[in-house]
Amino acid sequence: MNDLKLDKVSKVLKEVRKSVPLVHCITNYVTINDCANILLSYGASPAMCEAYDEVFDFVKISSALYINIGTFTREQESSAILAAVSAKTHNIPVVLDPVACAAIPKKIQFIDKLFKVGRVDVIKGNIGEIKFLAGETSNVKGVDSLEDGEGALECSRILSEKYNCVVAATGKKDFIVQGKNSAIIENGTEMLTNITGAGCMLGALCAAACGAFEDKFMAVVGAILSINIASEEAYKEAKAPGSFRVKLIDCIYELSEEKLKKEGKIAWN
């Protein structure tokens, strides 16, 4: 059974490269270029469109919408709400990355509004952010989580049931939950924490996967497994942050279904 699931997860990569999903990103200025480049390497087509007068119509032609609230401006907030309304109207999957929501209360107000007027299919955050959204005390420092993973699965399940969506909590181990289904991924490298934007790039990949693959739970598992295995490959040749960041994008480009099936370390429940 586990081999069959891993086989399905590996097919996410195949579907992304076959369909070349158009991923509409409203994201932060720190990592916008990295998100665009890793989407291209994954096989998707990025569009970093955030103008208020354009987003409603642009979502119509997109395969998925990625909303990252890392450096949110007032215009971005207005554009993201309108884009989410369009996504709800036109049945476009939405991935939300609640960056620094545990540190800035106003971000919670935006998230609440997003669920009320728009749609969210996936919440992808670090463990600290996910625990905070689930109503638990979390240990964070700005945009970074200081959590060790304790309680992450339970909090992800609470949040998934509350919002009826896929929840991914990332850390040393990555926890993905949808209802009663869960997966824990143990691939990856600590070097991901030494570059800015690893989580943002992952969120973009999750959106691409959701835009290409009908099973959103498996799509998110596939996206996370992809960046984790790519990071392991990158670290074999790049031991410092600058070269690792570049090599990570290269390794996403070079990734194969066979590599995912061979190297994947996933515990299913």
Swiss-Prot record:
GO BP annotations, alphabetical order: thiamine biosynthetic process; thiamine diphosphate biosynthetic process
InterPro entries in the record: Hyethyz_kinase, Ribokinase-like
Names of the cofactor(s): Mg(2+)
Residues at which substrate binds: 48, 197
GO function terms (MF aspect): ATP binding; hydroxyethylthiazole kinase activity; magnesium ion binding
Catalyzed reactions per annotation: 5-(2-hydroxyethyl)-4-methylthiazole + ATP = 4-methyl-5-(2-phosphooxyethyl)-thiazole + ADP + H(+)
EC number(s) stated in the UniProt entry for this protein: 2.7.1.50
Enzyme class: transferase
Stored CDD domains: THZ_kinase
SUPFAM superfamilies associated with the record: Ribokinase-like
Organism: Clostridium kluyveri (strain ATCC 8527 / DSM 555 / NBRC 12016 / NCIMB 10680 / K1)
Name assigned to this protein: Hydroxyethylthiazole kinase
Binding site for ATP: 124, 170
Physiological role: Catalyzes the phosphorylation of the hydroxyl group of 4-methyl-5-beta-hydroxyethylthiazole (THZ).
NCBIfam families in alphabetical order: PRK09355.1, thiM
UniProt pathway annotation: Cofactor biosynthesis; thiamine diphosphate biosynthesis; 4-methyl-5-(2-phosphoethyl)-thiazole from 5-(2-hydroxyethyl)-4-methylthiazole: step 1/1
UniProt keyword annotations, A-Z: ATP-binding, Kinase, Magnesium, Metal-binding, Nucleotide-binding, Thiamine biosynthesis, Transferase
Pfam families named in the record: HK
Family per similarity comment: Belongs to the Thz kinase family.
